[in-house]
Every structure is written in C-alpha cells, then in structure tokens.
Amino acid sequence: MLGVSLGARLLRGVGGRRGQFGARGVSEGSAAMAAGESMAQRMVWVDLEMTGLDIEKDQIIEMACLITDSDLNILAEGPNLIIKQPDELLDSMSDWCKEHHGKSGLTKAVKESTVTLQQAEYEFLSFVRQQTPPGLCPLAGNSVHADKKFLDKHMPQFMKHLHYRIIDVSTVKELCRRWYPEDYEFAPKKAASHRALDDISESIKELQFYRNNIFKKKTDEKKRKIIENGENEKPVS
C-alpha cells in the first residue's frame, strides 16, 4: 500500500498536466509510478562490527551497506567505514573480540581511523536517501536484530529513513534447518571473516540459496498446478 502511494504521488505530478502533455504525460506518469514501486521493494543490507553486544557500553567500530532489489541483485554499494573509538574501549573488549578483531586487522584500523560516529551516520543516511524512498525499505542482514539495536541508539536518523520491519536471514536459516534439513546441508558455509562488507555479501548469497533451492520448489509447484488446471479447462463454446 505504501509503495502504491509513492507511485501514485509521482503519477499525479505528471498526470495532472495531462491537458498540456497528452498521452506522453500519462506514459511518463505510469513509468514514474512503476519506478516508485520498484524502489519501494529494495532492501537495505547492513552489517556492523561492534566492540561487543552490550548496548549500554559497547560501540560500533565498522559498518557497511549494500542495496539490493527484491530479487537480491546488488544495485548499489554504499560506504564501508571504520569508526574511531577510544583505546580504553578497545582494551576492555572481550577475549573473543580482541582475538577476531585483532586477527582481521580491524582493531588496528579503528585506532588509525578519524571517522566519527556522527560522520558515519551522515554518510550512510546520504547514501540510502539517494537509493530508497523514505520509510518503505527494510533493514536486512544476518542476525540483523542485534545490529538494529545499536543503529536505533547510535544512528537514529538513519533508522528513521527505513521501514520498521526487518529481513533477518538468520530466521530463514533456522526455519530451513528445521523444515528442509536435507536441502539445508548444501547451504553456503560462512568464511567468518568478521568484516562488515564480507558478512553482508555472504548473507545475500545465503538468502539467494534459500530462495533458489527451497522457496523455489513451492513456487514451481504452484506454477505447475496453475498450468495443469489451465490445460484441463476446456473453452466454453
């Protein structure tokens, strides 16, 4: 409904001058409406690396963002920023974070970064404003509910631009693991680099796998039934 409203607003803007532009105005309006509806179907893929999962004390140290269409084709690659945090916070990270962020080179990169949290939010907000209409496109990612908590707190303007719903690949993963265990065995394995852009790319590939190998079965079955029913129906003379 929201996507249609966006397209309708675009259509009214062009179609309202119908007397001046005639059929061309209607055609342009239809194209604008279709474009608006298409943009409303986009997904905003985000991954964060944090100093931990405690929302009260931990902070974002890396963020990346990609935009896909509803078919999971990547349309735009956004910023991939490393955010400056005080050494005291890095020194107080858990052993797990120290090991993995140290091994990936992220800890060193955070110490060398000059990008503030406010600057990062501005960059990401500018990017999603160019790529998506306000309030219509959901946040997507793996266990993205955890990222959302930090974004709600530290990047509220960025989150305000997105739809309130999320697309969490980890939910799909857990359902497929329970309902289609034989297919799930072939799901792509994660490299676990614990870097933001790599993690997003892996999440998109994982959801593509579920769509092509699990959701597709039901879609093909439905198409087959429609075709069979259509072929069985005889035209009325």
Curated annotation (Swiss-Prot):
Provide the site residues for: Important for dinucleotide binding: 53, 96, 164
Principal subcellular localisation of the protein: mitochondrion
Quick check: keyword DNA repair in the entry?
no
Entry's family note: Belongs to the oligoribonuclease family.
* InterPro entries named in the record: Exonuclease_RNaseT/DNA_pol3 (IPR013520), Oligoribonuclease (IPR022894), RNaseH-like_sf (IPR012337), RNaseH_sf (IPR036397)
Q: Which residues carry this modification: Phosphoserine?
A: 92
Query: One GO MF term, please?
Result: 3'-5'-DNA exonuclease activity
Exonuclease domain: residues covered: 43-207
Name assigned to this protein? Oligoribonuclease, mitochondrial
Q: What is the recorded function of this protein according to its Swiss-Prot or TrEMBL entry?
A: 3'-to-5'exoribonuclease that preferentially degrades DNA and RNA oligonucleotides composed of only two nucleotides. Binds and degrades longer oligonucleotides with a lower affinity. Plays dual roles in mitochondria, scavenging nanoRNAs (small RNA oligonucleotides of <5 nucleotides) that are produced by the degradosome and clearing short RNAs that are generated by RNA processing. Essential for correct initiation of mitochondrial transcription, degrading mitochondrial RNA dinucleotides to prevent RNA-primed transcription at non-canonical sites in the mitochondrial genome.
Record-listed E.C. numbers: 3.1.15.-
Active-site residue list: 194
* Cofactor(s), names only, from the UniProt record: Mn(2+); Mg(2+)
Phosphotyrosine, modified sites: 122
Q: Name one GO biological process term.
A: nucleobase-containing compound metabolic process
Q: Which UniProt keywords apply?
A: Acetylation, Cytoplasm, Exonuclease, Hydrolase, Magnesium, Manganese, Metal-binding, Mitochondrion, Nuclease, Nucleus, Phosphoprotein, Transit peptide
Species in which this protein is naturally found: Rattus norvegicus
Residues holding Mg(2+) 1: 47, 49, 199
Which proteins does it associate with, and in what oligomeric form?
A: Homodimer. Homotetramer.
One GO cellular component term of this record is: mitochondrial intermembrane space
Annotated organelle transit peptide span: 1-25
User: Under which main EC class is this enzyme filed?
Assistant: hydrolase
Residues holding Mg(2+) 2: 47, 147
Which locations, inside or outside the cell, does it occupy? Mitochondrion intermembrane space; Mitochondrion matrix; Mitochondrion; Cytoplasm
